[in-house]
Regions:
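Acidic donor-binding loop of glycosyltransferase active sites
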Residues: 99, 287-299, 312
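Short alpha-helical donor nucleotide-sugar binding micro-motif in glycosyltransferases
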Residues: 276-277, 284-289, 307-308
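Conserved acidic donor-binding segment of nucleotide-sugar-dependent glycosyltransferases
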Residues: 329-342, 351-356
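Donor nucleotide-sugar binding/catalytic pocket of nucleotide-sugar-dependent glycosyltransferases
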Residues: 57, 133, 144, 148-200, ...
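Short hydrophobic beta-strand element within catalytic cores of glycosyltransferases
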Residues: 313-322, 335
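Conserved donor-binding/catalytic core segment of Leloir-type glycosyltransferases
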Residues: 210-226, 232-235
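N-terminal subdomain of nucleotide-sugar transferases
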Residues: 1-57, 122, 395-398
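Nucleotide-activated donor-binding/catalytic signature segment of Leloir-type glycosyltransferases, i.e.
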Residues: 259-276
Length: 398
């Protein structure tokens, strides 16, 4: 098959959806399929390159302005640059895809490539990554409005087949986009196990002068959906019992409320913010940690699953039925707390720091669970089976 993979976010940009799109593209190519990845320009990345067995084209893009608010996003829009509509369609005309894999329901490249697929009657999968939700009433209202008047009408016209990663995503998509079993597949997040089989690139404890005390790593961009507030508000209790604890927040800060709250609580000195780090360094941060947690507002995303795979005890905030068909057992093969529950975070962290043997046992079981169910090779095969079925159905209808 010829498969076009489309995502505004793509390496060298860091982030879960960027890494997942690139990893799946590499897997498709490794299995003998011809792959074209189309994304938005980013930093000094080449406009056109071949890597890992497939071609990557980066279209010129306009960056979203940084408004200096407590919430800002590093996003780029390709549709605003003159000629990009024509460039994109020419690329796809020349490539002649059998199917298109879109990533991100609110990205303009997904919409443009989706329009191409609709016009040419091509099967398309749309993976839902980030959910447009926020605990902040103002932002939450704005996101809901955008979903209602912009995103949902576009998706209703495009009619993609949805790929939904977890129960939170299922509930969200049913409510916002009217999805159902008839137009959806439920595949887990793909975790690149190979990235954690390489030598560590960095001595994180030495790099950040962490010493030998307990370290909590919280990895992933700070956005309203992952605001770090439950962890910050748990810190006074944690530090009271384990005064040497350091929290290392890894990722860009687009929502800085947690830093202000840390100042109010007098725990800011225990927090180190690194900014974004290369994908290759992520295993080193997990290896330096005693505990990893950042999905505390409801969720268990790529970073949390990678942390579990690495063999570090990881706390998330989902229910045991979060991944259809995958058995999660709190306290055995996963560590779960209720969303936005700082008291539960504090008690879980303290218990884990008090009992290194239990911490190591749960970490071992988490790693085995992720390796068995979320491995990139397993998830890629599920996507390819779906593409093959959709392509056959499309050929019959032509």
């Amino acid at each position: 098959m010829r498969i076009a993979v489309v995502n505004n976010f793509f390496p060298p940009r860091v982030g879960g959806s960027a890494h997942m799109a690139a990893s799946l593209a590499e897997q498709y190519a490794a299995r003998g399929h011809e792959v074209l990845a189309i994304t938005a320009a980013y930093a000094d990345a080449p406009a056109d390159e071949t890597k890992d067995g497939y071609r990557v084209v980066r279209l010129p893009a306009v960056k979203m302005p940084q408004l200096g608010l407590s919430i800002d996003f590093d996003m780029s829009f390709a549709s605003l640059r003159p000629g990009n509509w024509r460039r994109l369609w020419k690329l796809l005309d020349e490539f002649k895809p059998d199917a298109i894999h879109l990533h991100g329901q609110f990205f303009d490249l997904s919409w443009l490539a989706g329009l191409y697929a609709r016009r040419h009657k091509l099967p398309m999968l749309l993976t839902i990554h980030t959910l447009l939700i926020s605990d902040n009433k103002l932002y939450g209202g704005v996101f809901r409005f955008l979903d209602s008047v912009l995103v949902n009408p576009i998706l209703r016209y495009l009619k993609p087949r949805f790929v939904i990663l977890d129960k939170l995503g299922v509930d969200y998509c049913v409510e916002r986009y009217g999805t159902s079993d008839a137009n959806s597949d439920y595949f887990p997040i793909a975790v690149d196990t190979g990235n954690f089989e390489k030598p560590l690139t960095l001595d994180v404890r030495a790099e950040h002068k962490l010493g030998d005390g307990p370290v909590i790593v919280s990895l992933g961009h700070v956005i309203p959906l992952r605001n770090r507030l439950p962890l910050v508000e748990a810190l006074p209790s944690i530090l009271d019992k384990h005064p040497g604890v350091k929290v290392v927040v890894v990722g860009r800060v687009y929502h800085d409320v947690f830093l202000k709250r840390a100042e109010e609580l007098g725990v800011a000195d225990a927090i180190i913010v690194t900014g974004a780090v290369p994908k290759a360094d992520v295993p080193a941060y997990f290896a330096a940690a005693d505990i990893v947690t950042h999905d505390l507002n409801g969720g268990c995303g790529t970073a949390s699953l990678e942390a579990m795979l690495s063999g570090t005890a990881t706390i998330a905030s989902v229910t045991e039925d979060n991944y259809p068909g995958i058995e999660l057992r709190n306290g055995e093969n996963i560590l779960l707390v209720r969303p936005d529950d700082s008291e539960a975070v504090a008690s879980t962290v303290i218990e884990l720091l008090d009992d290194p043997q239990k911490r190591a046992l749960v970490a071992q079981r988490e790693s085995a669970m992720v390796r068995a169910n979320f491995g990139l090779d397993v998830v890629a095969e599920e996507h390819l089976r779906t593409f093959e079925k959709l392509v056959i159905e499309a050929d019959v209808l032509r």
